[in-house]
Amino acid sequence: MLKRPSKLQTTIDFEKNGKQTGYIRLPHSVHRSAYGWLPIPIACIKNGSGVTVLLISGTHGDEYEGQVALSKLINQLKPEEIQGRVIIVPMANFPAAKAGLRTSPIDEQNLNRIYPGDPDGSPSFMIAHYIESQLLSIADYGLDLHSGGSSLHYVPSAVSAVGENKERMKKMKELMKAFAAPYSFFFPSGHADGTTNHAASRNNVVLIGTELGGSGTVSPECLQICELGIKRFLQACGVIQAKT
């Protein structure tokens, strides 16, 4: 499926230096708009050569901590502060995020269970295909921000799936330590089928995730853990320098 071209498009030039903001255009042909599209926000901040880091939130639309933190980061992060490239997708499943729901109100799909997606599928499958084929395919590191959403509340944690690649596992542990959530844990790889973790593994991307609070709210404590953790994560990836 990944070899078939994505129908999603963006005005972002991922090879261009500087800060760019815009949208991934998700085709959505309906009665009121035959050639309509849904706007998935995206930013690319690049300065010269270096690693590429992909930051994602809003996979589940009712998980707000990551969406708030990444939206703020887009405004704050300057090209001259980095070496390499940071790609930020704060509302990955835009239909779900707009509605404040875990799953998409358009096709009822859970974006974090359907990777590698399908370029000819329903909107959620098309999003999953784009993220894996166009974004994870060019990334070295990834951070997938989650919380408990409306129905769960997690202790603030950094998480990832167990893998067979020892070097990749070692780096994931380093990134978890750098993120410095109160808790960190690995879950069995069998639980990762269809998830961003599974997609990252296929693309040899060193990716960790988070579970930061929930209950359909945003707490100042979890938001601070998220914001500070993102900065330490970027430092550990080597894309920004620690301030002295």
Regions flagged by a language model, labelled:
Residues 1-244:
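Structured catalytic-domain cores with a bias toward divalent-metal coordination
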